[in-house]
């Protein structure tokens, strides 16, 4: 028995705890429950990154849980089902409604097919549910069929004939009442929920892909997740908060890839005035369209204003509108080199005052700011990013962030002037997290300017590179496009540097992560050039999801995801996803290769995780409460 601490603050806390557990029996019952949970296998964690708005590929990886579902199907059915039969069952789990519609259209939806599929789904759900408490499983079961599914999950091989017939009759009734379609959907949903206990999204939900809004809609209903903001996420967060340069960048990024749908249909952003202004102001017929010309100039003017307001950003080399020679159609870069421009069409740029918007440009920007700050659908998504996201997260012996921790060449943490105070390392990332939240809650000018810097700044933990937007927009010679990276990206090949970073963030090895890991996205792993995602003797894992199709020729694959289960870690390298239609008709799954590491000699249990530490603390508190009841310090309440 643990004697309770009699200090006033602790005694006050125990009295509050006694409201939840008002009797000795309720306290020790909870102790028994919590102690039992500690001895369950740890839940499976799924790590994804750099989705970049690719909805179909993201949904397939989410549905197949990076192959976890197929692994369980293989384990449960072994040789009793053929390869094709397992494929059909998995496709039904991934896309239940669509698969049923296809089967019905092919007139193969016989009672026998339904009965077979229901029996197989129940077996998969029963196997997965065995890793959790019955209470947790009940909470995961879709409400409409909660009682029936709960009954079917807890059948046993040694049941008497009456119980066997009872459960058989439940399935028969489902078929007789034409409820099988809904019931299959509910079982498939439960299986996917039990297959992965928690999802970590390590940044960049948004970017050039047009499906980011649909992805966010799905995440709103996901059972358990956290997000580490990527540079593209922070860009959209800044735009939704009303930062003009972020808005101009969001428009430019999407208009260059013809992603009008996410702007106009998903979020209700009207582009009418911008398009009309561009057509009336800029010359057509060049390699750059009038619309892109207009948004480019708006962006570089707005960026220039921020850079001039914040000399501490150290970005004066990005002030290039004033370096244009309009007579020769050239620009002088910071290194003194002179380059021809791909266009000399700059009718709104005053050489004497190049960063000031014209009255027409100001009107358009004001209108766009109003559109972004009043877009309800967008704001629901950004609210979710804030409530479930952060710059970094420490979880189960892992340090998660999207980009980097800025470093000097000697491996020390790089300092940044943050509104007059210098910060480095964890302190700097904490500032970045704070200023991002201030931009949303308060929306002051400095905080909004920082949102733009977090998107693009060399010392931003979400960026970590010198972004040459102007050169890419106006100079044909690609030698000017080279973007230097923060020393972090080369120095973290060293295990000792990774150890220094993890130590800075208080990451200690745990039974569920014996070495500790830094888990990043942001930089595609170029397997064609011999790059590997597991670096620094396993201490750095780069899991850029590779969802963006434009990167596939460079990376050689369609990216990586990570699974951490009770048996260890598995890094999955994926081939490109084809289409949902092909998955349905041919039962095709994403082809993946598995790299197993950190394999455990014993299964890792809840007791080995952060949740286990919290549970042990709860048990300690309850033991103190139990002692207080038994010695009369706190009275029981019936």
Model feature map: region roles:
Residues 1-638:
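Feature recognizes metal-dependent phosphohydrolase scaffolds
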């Amino acid at each position: 028995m643990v004697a309770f601490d009699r200090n006033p603050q602790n005694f006050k806390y125990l009295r509050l705890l006694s409201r939840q557990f008002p009797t000795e029996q309720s306290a020790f019952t909870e102790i028994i429950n919590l102690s039992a949970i500690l001895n369950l296998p740890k839940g499976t964690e799924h790590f994804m990154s750099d989705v970049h708005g690719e909805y179909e590929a993201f949904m397939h990886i989410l549905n197949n849980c990076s192959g976890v579902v197929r692994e369980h199907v293989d384990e449960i059915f072994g040789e009793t089902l053929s390869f094709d039969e397992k494929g059909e069952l998995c496709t039904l789990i991934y896309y239940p409604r669509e698969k049923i519609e296809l089967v019905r259209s092919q007139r193969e939806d016989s009672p026998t097919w339904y009965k077979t599929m229901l029996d197989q789904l129940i077996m998969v759900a029963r196997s997965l549910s065995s890793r959790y408490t019955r209470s947790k499983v009940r909470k995961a079961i879709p409400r409409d069929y909660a009682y029936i599914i709960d009954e079917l999950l807890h059948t046993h091989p040694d049941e008497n004939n009456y119980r066997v017939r009872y459960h058989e009759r439940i399935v028969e009734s489902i078929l007789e009442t034409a409820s099988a379609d809904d019931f299959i959907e509910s079982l498939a949903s439960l299986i996917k929920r039990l297959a992965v206990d928690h999802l970590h999204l390590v940044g960049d939900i948004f970017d050039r892909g047009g499906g980011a809004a649909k992805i966010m809609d799905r995440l709103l209903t996901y059972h358990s997740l956290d997000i580490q903001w990527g540079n593209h996420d922070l860009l959209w967060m800044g735009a939704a908060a009303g930062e003009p340069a972020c808005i101009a960048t969001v428009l430019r990024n999407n208009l260059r890839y013809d992603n009008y749908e996410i702007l106009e249909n998903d979020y209700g952003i009207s582009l009418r005035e911008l398009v009309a202004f561009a057509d009336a102001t800029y010359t057509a017929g060049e390699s750059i369209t009038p619309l892109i010309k207009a948004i480019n100039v708006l962006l570089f003017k707005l960026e220039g204003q921020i850079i001039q307001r914040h000399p501490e950003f150290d970005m004066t080399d990005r002030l290039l509108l004033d370096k244009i020679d309009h007579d020769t159609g050239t620009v002088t870069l910071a290194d003194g080199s002179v380059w021809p421009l791909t266009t000399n069409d700059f009718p709104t740029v005053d050489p004497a005052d190049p960063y000031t918007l014209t009255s027409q440009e100001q009107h358009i920007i004001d209108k766009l700011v109003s559109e972004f700050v009043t877009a309800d659908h967008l704001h629901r998504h950004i609210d979710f990013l804030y409530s479930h996201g952060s710059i970094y997260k420490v979880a189960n012996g892992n340090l998660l962030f999207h980009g980097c921790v800025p470093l000097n060449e000697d491996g020390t943490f790089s300092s940044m002037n943050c509104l007059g105070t210098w910060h480095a390392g964890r302190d700097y990332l904490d500032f970045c997290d704070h200023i991002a939240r201030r931009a949303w809650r308060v929306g002051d000018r400095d905080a909004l300017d920082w949102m733009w810097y977090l998107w693009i700044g060399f010392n931003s933990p979400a960026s970590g590179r010198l972004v040459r937007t102007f050169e890419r927009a106006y100079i044909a010679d690609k030698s000017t496009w080279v973007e230097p990276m923060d020393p972090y990206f080369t120095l973290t090949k060293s295990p000792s540097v990774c150890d220094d970073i993890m130590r800075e963030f208080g990451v200690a090895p745990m039974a569920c992560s014996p070495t500790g890991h830094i888990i990043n996205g942001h930089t595609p792993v170029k397997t064609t050039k011999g790059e590997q995602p597991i670096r620094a003797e396993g201490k750095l894992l780069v899991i850029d999801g590779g969802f963006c199709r434009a990167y596939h020729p460079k990376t050689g694959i369609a990216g990586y995801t990570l699974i951490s289960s009770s048996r260890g870690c598995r890094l999955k390298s994926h081939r490109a996803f084809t289409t949902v239609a092909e998955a349905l008709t041919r039962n095709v799954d994403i082809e993946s290769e598995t790299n197993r590491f950190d394999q455990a000699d014993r299964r890792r249990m809840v007791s080995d995780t952060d949740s286990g530490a919290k549970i042990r603390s709860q048990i300690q508190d309850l033991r103190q409460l139990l002692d207080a009841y038994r010695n009369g310090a706190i009275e029981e309440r019936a």
